[in-house]
């Protein structure tokens, strides 16, 4: 059913239907009633349209992710979608790649009132630019967050989680613990590296090596591990994602080394991949992060003056055969 058909059924112009759909107060009461009746009779999403007309809301949420190929991001999005649908909302997904121009294109939906609010998973370094584009619209940030500010956020304590992972390796007798990190424009990368280095310093370990992967992929993890094996190889590796850790495992095995006897490996995120390859990992409550982000956003939509909230959820260390 098109807007033209609704106009024909109501006996009004397409422009009048458009004004009704946009909740304009310039429409005569009798014409508004005709349009609403036509919508009802046409069975064209009657519940959604009726709600939009009553509340001046679209019941759509824009979700901007930095990398939908990242299993962690995909799981967070699943949690967002589940909670959104439970509350009568749908999501529009934008894979921004943390590119500000792509973000700008997606955010144009805010000014057109096509979406009621936005959930982002962009790099911390992009938050100031995003804030300028989003303005006062309801907004929640996932995983990447500022320590202070006006944007509500939900995530985990990355420093504590990484400290625990490195401490577990050190407690197991590992002396040469390396790290495979990623892009430092992401706050999680900086925080996890901070946790790694703090334990290395606290335990007075002589060995410290950080290799930066070009992407959050298995192939990038393989390349990073190859570099770590060149000189004075580690006896343990902590990777900031399960995909990087999976690549590291493959390189170790191809080099004829044993896991965990020669080199132990710990990942991060707690994805299905980690379970499949029996990888020790830090499990993030990814779907709960998504669900909580929706709760925060809907509260902001309903209460624009609601105070900013910073929610830190619990993580879990899962020990498997790689350590």
Regions found by a protein language model. Give the residues of each.
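Amphipathic helical "hinge" segments at domain boundaries
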Residues: 44-109, 113-116, 197
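N-terminal helix-turn-helix DNA-binding module of bacterial transcription factors
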Residues: 1-57
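Flexible loop/turn connectors
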Residues: 231-236, 240-323
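Flexible loop/hinge segments that line or gate small-molecule binding clefts
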Residues: 98, 120-164, 185, 243, ...
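Periplasmic-binding protein-like
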Residues: 114-121, 178-180, 211, 232-243, ...
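Short helix-capping segments at alpha-helix termini
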Residues: 86-87, 200-206, 229-233, 254-259
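Hinge/beta->alpha junction and helix N-cap segments in small-molecule ligand-binding domains
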Residues: 65-75, 93-102, 154-164, 180-224, ...
């Amino acid at each position: 059913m098109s807007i033209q058909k609704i106009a024909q059924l109501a006996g009004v112009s397409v422009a009048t239907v458009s004004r009704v759909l946009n909740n304009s107060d310039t429409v005569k009461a009798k014409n508004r009633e005709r349009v609403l009746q036509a919508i009802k009779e046409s069975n064209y999403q009657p519940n959604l349209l009726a709600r939009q007309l009553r509340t001046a809301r679209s019941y759509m949420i824009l979700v901007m992710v930095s990398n939908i190929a990242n299993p962690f991001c995909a799981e967070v999005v699943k949690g967002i979608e589940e909670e959104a649908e439970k509350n009568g909302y749908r999501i529009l997904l934008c894979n921004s790649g943390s590119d500000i121009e792509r973000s700008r294109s997606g955010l144009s939906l805010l000014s057109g009132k096509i979406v009621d609010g936005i959930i982002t998973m962009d790099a911390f370094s992009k938050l100031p630019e995003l804030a300028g584009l989003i303005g006062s619209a309801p907004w929640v940030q996932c995983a990447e967050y500022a320590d202070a500010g006006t944007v509500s956020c939900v995530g985990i304590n990355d420093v504590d989680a990484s400290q625990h992972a490195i401490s577990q390796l050190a407690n197991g007798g590992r002396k040469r613990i390396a790290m495979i990190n990623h892009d430092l424009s992401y706050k999680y990368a900086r925080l996890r590296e901070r946790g790694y280095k703090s334990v290395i310093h606290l335990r007075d370990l002589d060995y410290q090596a950080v290799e930066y992967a070009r992407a959050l992929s298995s192939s990038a993890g393989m390349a990073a591990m190859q570099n770590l094996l060149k000189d004075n190889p580690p006896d343990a590796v902590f990777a900031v994602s399960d995909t990087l850790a999976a690549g590291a495992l493959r390189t170790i095995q191809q080099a004829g080394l044993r896991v965990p006897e020669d080199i132990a490996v710990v990942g991060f995120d707690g994805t299905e991949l980690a379970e499949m390859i029996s990888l020790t990992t830090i499990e993030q409550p990814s779907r709960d992060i998504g669900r909580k982000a929706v709760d925060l956003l809907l509260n902001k939509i309903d209460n624009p003056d609601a105070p900013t909230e910073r929610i830190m959820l619990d993580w879990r260390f899962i020990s498997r055969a790689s350590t």
